[in-house]
Amino acid sequence: MAGQNTMEGEAVALLMEAVVTPRAQPNNTTITAIQPSRSAEKCYYSDSENETADEFLRRIGKYQHKIYHRKKFCYITLIIVFVFAMTGAAFALGYITSQFVG
């Protein structure tokens, strides 16, 4: 659980340190409003020279998704092991008591 909080903290810290580097535009032009048809500017991070915000978030999302499935697999495995252990214990207890009764 602590590792997940650390990773989320790092992801938030990297997002907070994002540096927006717009495409080169002439100095004499001013942008009054972003047109809806115009594609959004790409956002790059100071840590990486070629990783955009979308790529970064996709990478972090895949990592979080992988951890979620790994935990889910571990929980299901533990439940199955517990059920088999209890079933084995019940059969063993039945066998032992049958030795004394019968």
UniProtKB/Swiss-Prot annotation:
The keyword Secreted does not apply. Residues 1-75 are intravirion. One of its GO terms (biological process) is intracellular transport of virus. The modification Phosphoserine is found at residues 46, 48. Phosphorylated on serines within the acidic cluster, possibly by host CK2. Phosphorylation determines whether endocytosed viral US9 traffics to the trans-Golgi network or recycles to the cell membrane. InterPro entries: Herpes_US9. The chain crosses the membrane at residues 76-96. A motif (Di-leucine internalization motif) lies at residues 14-15. It comes from the Viruses. Disulfide bonds: none annotated. Keywords: Host cell membrane, Host endoplasmic reticulum, Host Golgi apparatus, Host membrane, Membrane, Phosphoprotein, Signal-anchor, Transmembrane, Transmembrane helix, Viral envelope protein, Virion. Residues 41-55 are annotated as: Acidic. It is a single-pass type II membrane protein. One of its GO terms (cellular component) is host cell Golgi membrane. Residues 97-102 are virion surface. It is found in: Virion membrane; Host Golgi apparatus membrane; Host smooth endoplasmic reticulum membrane; Host cell membrane. Belongs to the alphaherpesvirinae envelope protein US9 family. Essential for the anterograde spread of the infection throughout the host nervous system. Together with the gE/gI heterodimer, US9 is involved in the sorting and transport of viral structural components toward axon tips. This is Envelope protein US9.
